[in-house]
A protein has these predicted regions:
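N-terminal signal peptide c-region/cleavage motif recognized by signal peptidases
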Residues: 16-18
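An extracytoplasmic/periplasmic, membrane-proximal ligand-sensing/linker region
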Residues: 26-28, 211, 237, 259-320
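Stable alpha-helical elements in mature extracytoplasmic
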Residues: 40, 44, 48, 52, ...
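Bacterial N-terminal signal peptides that target proteins for export
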Residues: 1-8
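N-terminal (or domain-start) structured segment
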Residues: 21-111, 149-151, 157, 173-197, ...
Length: 320
């Protein structure tokens, strides 16, 4: 009798969840972006939110909650009800944070549900045009001559731009000095001024700066050249075949969000990413739309967490 009762209770819960998902959403959805306005995650999140709103017939409102590498915004997500009406769009920093912080106020594998991958984009190593390092070789030679003294800009300790630069150092066998800034704008300004040797900028940030002649591309992190910035030669073609790094963006929900809602969101996001307008908007920014089922995305996130832990350990980056 207990077994039958337990089975019946489970069946009722499943039916209730399916019914909830079928009616979902019945009110506006909030999407937290734990990074600054204008960041890659913010831009990608807003593009997806607009078209997701059209698909779901409900407003999808983006709210920026930057700070502490995304930790503050992530906490805001976890303080919300797990009902599918509060989501988060974040970058690869989500996977780097467990390696950067000694203790996080949440468990990224247990407290957060992986909903969907949105897209991937390469980094561009940009330096002051006409500056001290006109080529990648010149930069690496200088770093070998002065270990740990050549400064590079990052959008904060543990940011994806920091990790991408540290990985350059590891594959090139050099030591460089991280100069962390509050965000990308400040990092770019000092790179333009020549106060830092380079900045690993997401390609959507680099496109305008390079076309305006304010910065020069020393290389791109992907194995292939980008159509939107063909002047950037892959690091893999400049003597570092192992270097292949991309910045990615994803969507998450609080743990406890009904699985049927997660599946519905994933399916809708996958559909949005095939929309011609979205493909064109992403393409102009150098972002490749890419979708994964929730389970596959979860495996991807776990592998990225492991990768960042290795980078942090090898670079001996002090935990915050």
């Amino acid at each position: 009798m207990k077994t039958i009762a337990g089975f019946s209770a489970a069946a009722i819960l499943c039916a209730a969840g399916a019914s909830f998902a079928q009616d979902y959403p019945t009110k506006p959805i909030r999407v937290i972006v734990p990074l600054t306005p204008g960041s890659g995650a913010d831009i990608a999140g807003r593009i997806v939110a607009k078209h997701l709103s059209d698909a779901l017939k409900q407003p999808v409102l983006v709210e920026n909650r930057p700070g502490a590498g995304g930790v503050i915004g992530t906490q805001a997500l976890l303080n919300a009800d797990a009902d599918g009406y509060t989501l988060m769009v974040q970058s690869a920093s989500h996977a780097a944070n467990p390696a950067i912080y000694k203790t996080l106020p949440y468990d990224p594998l247990k407290d957060i549900v992986d909903v969907a991958l949105l897209g991937m984009t390469p980094y561009v190593m940009i330096a002051a045009r006409g500056g001290a390092y006109p080529t990648l070789k010149a930069l690496i030679d200088a770093a070998k001559a002065k270990p740990g003294q050549i400064p590079f800009a990052s959008a904060g300790v543990g940011s994806s731009t920091h990790m991408a630069a540290e990985y350059v150092a590891q594959v090139a066998g050099i030591k460089i000095l991280n100069i962390p800034y509050k965000g990308s704008p400040e990092a770019i300004q000092d790179t333009i001024a020549g106060r830092t040797a380079f900045y690993m900028a997401p390609i959507n940030t680099a496109i305008g700066l390079v076309s305006e002649g304010r910065l020069a591309p020393l290389g791109i992190s992907s194995r292939r050249r980008s159509e939107v910035l063909p002047a950037a030669v892959p690091l893999a073609e400049q003597g570092f075949p192992a270097y292949d790094v991309t910045l990615w963006f994803g969507m998450w929900a609080p743990a406890g969000t009904p699985p049927a809602v997660v599946q519905r969101l994933n399916a809708q996001v996958a559909s949005v990413l095939k929309n011609r307008e979205v493909v064109e908007q992403f393409g102009k920014l150098g972002i490749g739309p890419q979708s994964m089922a929730p389970e596959e995305f979860g495996r991807f996130v776990r592998s990225e967490i492991t990768t960042y832990q290795r980078i942090v350990k090898q670079a001996a980056i002090p935990q915050q």
